[in-house]
């Protein structure tokens, strides 16, 4: 985190409400659209085997057990909403910390007081991982331009619209694009 400054209220209640709505709650493990075993509010159990609390299955994941094979091992396992909330918050905080280190545009947005726009990046990192977000090089460059007054926030939204993520993600992408353009939570 730059200069050890205290964090503003990130994640905000608005971001957490967005994630609940956009991810939806599933008590039982399922395969998401990419074939990844997921539970709760979009928690990727393949990326976070520590949430399994099953040492034998956690070890299998670390050795490469994925998809339907992992799902079969988890048959009958469920999460409460409280467990899902705790995992979601933990993941959001991990994403936030990674963005502070790896995404200068996130830091600039936070420092400029553009928290709704910063949380668009945090929402996207939660959805696709920090590495996935960092592939949006054109959009991140447009954010720099908007912060410097070289282009508009509408241009940043247009950058998002040109991505495969936009076409695949639908309602969520449209809401986050609008939030980036307006600076108001969608």
Name these PLM-found stretches.
Residues 139-145:
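Primarily short, surface-exposed interaction patches in extracytoplasmic proteins
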Residues 1-120, 133-134, 147-186:
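Acidic, aromatic-lined catalytic clefts of primarily extracellular/periplasmic carbohydrate-active enzymes
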Residues 123-128:
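Short, hydrophobic/amphipathic alpha-helical patches that form generic packing surfaces
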């Amino acid at each position: 985190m730059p200069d050890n400054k205290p964090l503003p209220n990130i994640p905000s209640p608005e971001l957490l409400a967005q994630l609940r709505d956009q991810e939806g709650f599933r008590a039982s493990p399922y395969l998401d659209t990419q074939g990844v075993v997921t539970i709760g509010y979009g928690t990727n159990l393949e990326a976070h085997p520590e949430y399994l609390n099953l040492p034998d299955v956690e070890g299998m994941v670390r050795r490469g057990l994925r998809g339907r094979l992992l799902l079969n091992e988890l048959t009958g396992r469920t999460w409460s909403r409280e467990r899902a909330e705790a995992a979601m918050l933990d993941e959001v905080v991990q994403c936030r910390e990674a963005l502070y280190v790896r995404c200068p545009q996130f830091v600039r947005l936070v420092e400029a007081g553009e928290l709704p726009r910063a949380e668009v990046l945090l929402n996207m990192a939660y959805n696709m991982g920090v590495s996935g977000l960092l592939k949006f090089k054109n959009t991140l460059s447009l954010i720099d331009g908007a912060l410097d007054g070289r282009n508009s926030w509408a241009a940043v939204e247009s950058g998002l619209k040109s991505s495969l993520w936009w076409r695949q993600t639908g309602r969520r992408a449209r809401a986050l694009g609008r939030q980036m353009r307006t600076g108001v939570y969608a």
